[in-house]
């Protein structure tokens, strides 16, 4: 059977730097036009080059909304397993990794973290994701949730095996009430709870708000023990994040991986190419995958099944579609005609979102980052 997603290489274009781009990409593990992407993070917090192929350490697994390194990210937070000590600092918790121990697909990511002897796997839906951690035998296994800097909140709820929090990190131009609310549920009870604010870890303190906060939860693990984490987020509220978590349903990890693969194949199989060699197939479908990431969905489905969105223009929750993170002065030439041709029903939703942008801001965008409206006279 035709399996075009297996030609996609999300690592293509990641050997880039500020000085020299070979694509300025990161491995966006995502669904087509998903509200949230996930990426392994090799760069320091706030670095636009968040994953670089030549790096040898991973600092965390980050929910990201970044369209380019120049525009940078917003609402991001990171998750990282560690063993031994509850290290939360981004440098101290980082682990060596090798590309030989890494699998990157559009719909699935797996890596062996050598320093911690932990295998991390993740698979996303539009607004949620599931992690599968395989731990070694250790009295002190931990998972760090880093809500990052520029204003964040964290709360550990051990009786529900849950962590909630929000990030207000952004690149400017946001309404005062901007937050990315996240909810994380684990399938193993905690035997250790701590939160950190800035550079200080407080064991037993379950809630913190500061410039840079996060949480560390821990437990004893057996060799090969698997711990799952369900993650969802919302730009509207914690309650909406819990609704978005329902995208995962009762599916297990492997079922979600297969569903993600099926969705990508459904979209990518709209074009079947002939002739050429394997490298050309990989190039074509990797670029096709990149063409189906942005503009991303910035809308959510509420408890009544209605399409709603947090407006990055006036801070209100309003009905209707919203898409973002695309530079129209680049994408009007080819991307939008292509989407109109190949995915007219999705392009219609994007155009409705453009009308909503005009209603809420008074302008059509030229470079629409959800939180920044860039327009030139």
Feature names for model-found ranges:
Residues 1-336, 340-371, 375:
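Accessory carbohydrate-recognition regions in carbohydrate-active enzymes
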